[in-house]
């Protein structure tokens, strides 16, 4: 149902340990059934693993990984004259980070390590190096957009 005015964006409070809004958003993406403390434990555990394994600042690795995974373009279906075309469109910044976070979460879930913290740590380390499941997903989306470049004149 249409609304009379635009609903204001909710302000997300920065996470308690690092004071970073991106980390807080990632915790919210990771959270299941409203269990924020569990999500916090997983993320901070992953950051501890990263610190031990890479001897680097975990926030640095996290932001590099997220920057690498963020997609620039994606495809959207557009119906023109009875045919559906996959039209490449640029991704707006808020959606870029949301997709990146979702892809990292899903890639970490599919990994084989014992705890979710370890899976997440290894996925973030790989994404920071430009490999891993989340990067594979990004490349796949970019490939789809590149393949359908011919339909880019069907802009939305």
From Swiss-Prot:
An individual GO BP term: translation
Record flagged with keyword Ribonucleoprotein: yes
Species this chain originates from: Polynucleobacter asymbioticus (strain DSM 18221 / CIP 109841 / QLW-P1DMWA-1)
Annotated family: Belongs to the universal ribosomal protein uS7 family.
Known function: One of the primary rRNA binding proteins, it binds directly to 16S rRNA where it nucleates assembly of the head domain of the 30S subunit. Is located at the subunit interface close to the decoding center, probably blocks exit of the E-site tRNA.
Keywords linked to the UniProt accession: Ribonucleoprotein, Ribosomal protein, RNA-binding, rRNA-binding, tRNA-binding
A molecular function (GO) term: tRNA binding
Any single GO CC term annotated in Swiss-Prot or TrEMBL for this entry: small ribosomal subunit
UniProt keyword Membrane, yes or no: no
Coiled-coil residue windows: none
InterPro entries per UniProt: Ribosomal_uS7 (IPR000235), Ribosomal_uS7_bac/org-type (IPR005717), Ribosomal_uS7_CS (IPR020606), Ribosomal_uS7_dom (IPR023798), Ribosomal_uS7_dom_sf (IPR036823)
Record Pfam families: Ribosomal_S7
Transmembrane segments: none
Gene3D superfamilies hit by this protein: Ribosomal protein S7 domain
Subunit text: Part of the 30S ribosomal subunit. Contacts proteins S9 and S11.
SUPFAM superfamilies: Ribosomal protein S7
Protein's UniProt name: Small ribosomal subunit protein uS7
């Amino acid at each position: 149902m249409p609304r009379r005015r635009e609903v204001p964006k909710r302000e997300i409070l920065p996470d308690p340990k690092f004071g970073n809004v991106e980390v807080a958003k990632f915790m919210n993406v990771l959270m299941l059934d409203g269990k924020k403390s569990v999500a916090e434990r997983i993320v901070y555990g992953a950051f501890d693993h990263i610190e031990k394994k890479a001897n680097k600042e975990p926030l640095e690795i996290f932001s590099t990984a997220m920057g690498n995974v963020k997609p620039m373009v994606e495809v959207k279906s557009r119906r023109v004259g009875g045919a559906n075309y996959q039209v490449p469109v640029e991704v707006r910044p808020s959606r870029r980070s949301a997709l990146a976070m979702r892809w990292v979460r899903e890639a970490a879930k599919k990994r084989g390590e014992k705890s979710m913290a370890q899976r997440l740590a290894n996925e973030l380390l790989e994404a920071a190096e430009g490999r891993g499941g989340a990067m594979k997903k990004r490349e796949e989306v970019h490939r789809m957009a590149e393949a359908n470049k011919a339909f880019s004149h069907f802009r939305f």
